Amino acid sequence: MMDKKKLHIAAGVICDKHNNVFIAQRPLKSHMGGFWEFPGGKLEDNETPEQALLRELQEEIGIDVTQCTLLDTVAHDFPDRHITLSFFLVTEWKNELTEKKGSCRVGHLLCL
């Protein structure tokens, strides 16, 4: 039996002052393409989950996070991989939310 690929992902639950939450749709050709998710990405070597979150949100949606708090870390086994997800509540940032080409199909602020 082959070992499953192991990934650690940092994701941001981006909540504005009006309690709107930003979600993004995964590119159709990616793993789980078309699904909706909180933006973020994989940790690089020697990177903490918070460092990965800050880097990924800048790369994917153009924001510089100034305030975030770890909400929870959960693990899930898919048939082909083991994923650890670290979720952060993001409440303050600089710059406007901008969908960068290739990072997501579309993003939306949803009212809770």
From Swiss-Prot:
| GO biological process, any | DNA repair
Which cofactor names does the annotation list? Mg(2+)
Every copy of the Nudix hydrolase domain together lies at: 6-112
Which keywords accompany this UniProt record? DNA damage, DNA repair, DNA replication, Hydrolase, Magnesium, Metal-binding, Mutator protein
An example of a GO molecular function for this protein is: 8-oxo-dGDP phosphatase activity
Identify the residue span(s) of motif Nudix box: 41-62
List, alphabetically, the CDD domains matched.
Answer: NUDIX_MutT_NudA_like (cd03425)
Checking Gene3D superfamilies in the record gives: Nucleoside Triphosphate Pyrophosphohydrolase
Q: Which reaction does it catalyse?
A: 8-oxo-dGTP + H2O = 8-oxo-dGMP + diphosphate + H(+); 8-oxo-GTP + H2O = 8-oxo-GMP + diphosphate + H(+)
Enzyme Commission code(s) on record? 3.6.1.55
The broad enzyme category this protein falls into is hydrolase
Coiled-coil annotated residue ranges, if any:
none
**Highest taxon, organism lineage:** Bacteria
The record lists its disulfide bonds as: none
Q: Which Pfam families match?
A: NUDIX_4 (PF14815)
The positions annotated for binding Mg(2+) are 40, 60
According to its UniProt entry, the function of this protein is described as: Specifically hydrolyzes both 8-oxo-deoxyguanosine triphosphate (8-oxo-dGTP) and 8-oxo-guanosine triphosphate (8-oxo-GTP) to the related monophosphates, thereby cleaning up the nucleotide pools and preventing misincorporation of 8-oxoGua into DNA and RNA. It prevents replicational errors by removing an oxidatively damaged form of guanine (8-oxo-dGTP) from DNA and the nucleotide pool. 8-oxo-dGTP can be inserted opposite dA and dC residues of template DNA with almost equal efficiency thus leading to A.T to G.C transversions.
Q: Which family does it belong to?
A: Belongs to the Nudix hydrolase family.
Protein name, as recorded: 8-oxo-dGTP diphosphatase
Organism expressing this protein natively:
Proteus vulgaris
Per UniProt, what is the name of the gene that codes for the protein in this document?
mutT
